[in-house]
């Protein structure tokens, strides 16, 4: 039975779904939206979508047969049976207005993901940090075990060459997005919570208690026979555990974890540790990712796999051979500067805790290298809300190149931009950051800043990732001709 035939069989269980043939995505170029669109294309739906710019996601969807419109317009939705929107889309978007006038159902991304999960064994991964890596690790473990899951991930899984794929089994492994509380639409069999911190607080009215309660509600979407896999190292997770009335499996470095990491060590890009599980033999593991935070992500994957009775041999092999995720401590090789070769790492982390974890991993793996960070803050609201935390963590590198805020559609907030943050870090007195007005200007500064043997870390969720790829490909005009090793 082909994948499409398998899904048509599932659709026959819901006769009403036969009415839905054409699905249009507004904002299809995002990783989450594009991933769901890719699964639906492969399930046999006629998929179209629009976005303001062409990117790798839209290019891939075109190759798969989706019709992509660059730019938004009312004509794009005329033939749609349903319109899927991301929360980043303005309600006054002409396609949304047209869909309302035509009485075409409009659903959020998470609602469509929930429909994909409805007749599958869903594994949903939530948390402030680590969702993409944890989801990727779980998908890799299940794939290694021959379970062939469907997955939807917020980043490129390097081994698959995509962030989403339609599998032939009953499993669906997906990120659960708390940024707009839409993860409450999901009804999985297994839920993972990696950690809980203050982020996207506008969604929750600035009320951290409301955010915590929403995570509890998310876990209570599990059936009574479902499993909540949670990180006991996180203090907020420990705080909400007494409120969770589902079966709980904990993981972490703590002695009271059900799935515990011991004997941690890191050398370069790889970590070694022992995992101890109740009622199971200890496993000595190699993880092809750096940092203690990634060991925690691996523990979550191990906990899920163990609950589903996946063989230990698949766990061992999948972790050792894991090829990583795009923009998650992605080693892009070395590139040449006038003063010598520099190691280049690109990372998506944009919350102070994520940046701190990345710095810690870089220090542990390459202690001899000078750490130069080019950081692009993401969103004015996040910069404002976590301003002091950003000052603290960004002061920990050896050299800081600070770009202006990537707005992600937000209006500027006085005192929460890159220049203000740069001044505040300078006043702290640990280092003298260099303000970079635009990503394009970064190339002009780097030759004077970088030294032989440096580790350059490009950090942030905005468009700085595209710049790092150009650096890796020696496209910025200051290469001395040394060989550049670009890793996927």
From Swiss-Prot:
Function: Cell wall formation.
InterPro entries hit by this protein: Mur-like_cat_sf (IPR036565), Mur_ligase_C (IPR004101), Mur_ligase_C_dom_sf (IPR036615), Mur_ligase_cen (IPR013221), Mur_ligase_N (IPR000713), MurCDEF_pg_biosynth (IPR050061), UDP-N-AcMur_Ala_ligase_MurC (IPR005758)
Cellular compartment(s): Cytoplasm
Pfam families referenced in this protein's UniProt entry, alphabetically: Mur_ligase, Mur_ligase_C, Mur_ligase_M
Binding site for ATP: 127-133
Catalytic activity: UDP-N-acetyl-alpha-D-muramate + L-alanine + ATP = UDP-N-acetyl-alpha-D-muramoyl-L-alanine + ADP + phosphate + H(+)
Biological process (GO), any one: peptidoglycan biosynthetic process
Recorded metabolic or biological pathway in which this protein acts: Cell wall biogenesis; peptidoglycan biosynthesis
Organism: Shewanella oneidensis (strain ATCC 700550 / JCM 31522 / CIP 106686 / LMG 19005 / NCIMB 14063 / MR-1)
Entry protein name: UDP-N-acetylmuramate--L-alanine ligase
Keywords: ATP-binding, Cell cycle, Cell division, Cell shape, Cell wall biogenesis/degradation, Cytoplasm, Ligase, Nucleotide-binding, Peptidoglycan synthesis
Main localization (coarse): cytoplasm
Molecular-function GO term, any one: UDP-N-acetylmuramate-L-alanine ligase activity
Classification via HAMAP family: MurC
EC number: 6.3.2.8
Cellular component GO terms, alphabetical: cytoplasm
Superkingdom of origin organism: Bacteria
Family in the record: Belongs to the MurCDEF family.
